[in-house]
Amino acid sequence: AHGRCVADSEGTTVPRRKRPSTPNASNLDWYAVDLHMHTPASKDYQQSGVAYLDILRKAEKEGLAAIAFTDHNTVQGYAAMRQEITDLERWEQSGRITPEERSRLEEYRRLLDRLLVLPGFELTATFGFHVLAIFDPATPLRTIELTLLRLNVPAGLLTAGETEVGSTTDVVTAYRIMAEAGALVIAPHANSSHGVAMFGLGFGGQTRIAYTQDPNLHALEVTDLESSK
């Protein structure tokens, strides 16, 4: 998993709490979420033997209210989880489900009743910059795949989960295409590796402004570089 995004730095959990009262704002609920999470569908996923159910259990253990599967240049992780659930439900309806399968299905239902899981992907844009696109769970997976194709991810790599997929789309164009598709657009780890505002970036001020203040960009994920977490 990557950074939790509720106006916090990478690796810091934001507990659910009431926002402090101010003269000009009503009290609002705050939630702990992780909108930058990889799964075994990403080629560089480090852990072996991890099931999608394990990812949901860990999210529940950490007190998260929502997570987004944002694998590299693919929506395959989210698709694989949904397909597993669909298969389990079909076996249940046909009466051919085993006790172990029924237990998994019931666990999925319990967790998904408590946890919002959003589909998305992490695009590798031109010059290696990363951009997240996160969608409503009602969005058809085909729509998300077509968005990847519009971003010039090769059709043959749509399910590969590769971090490098050749020449895709420049950052600002990626923001626009993602927003037009209905995505929440986030620049991940913006001030560190592959981030649009990383230190030592050899671009001018106008480019930095465009990369960080474009109207189609909805949020920046930043990293606390001094933290050991």
Task: Give residue ranges: language-model regions.
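Divalent metal-dependent hydrolysis catalytic cores, especially in the metallo-beta-lactamase
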Residues: 55-79, 184-186
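Acidic/histidine-rich helix-loop elements
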Residues: 38-50, 194-195
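Histidine-centered catalytic micro-motifs
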Residues: 32-42, 72-73, 191
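Hydrophobic faces of well-ordered beta-strands that scaffold small-molecule active sites
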Residues: 33-35, 67, 117-119, 185-187, ...
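Extended substrate/RNA-proximal surfaces in nucleic-acid metabolism proteins
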Residues: 11, 15-24, 80-216
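Functional cores that coordinate and move charged inorganic groups
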Residues: 227-229
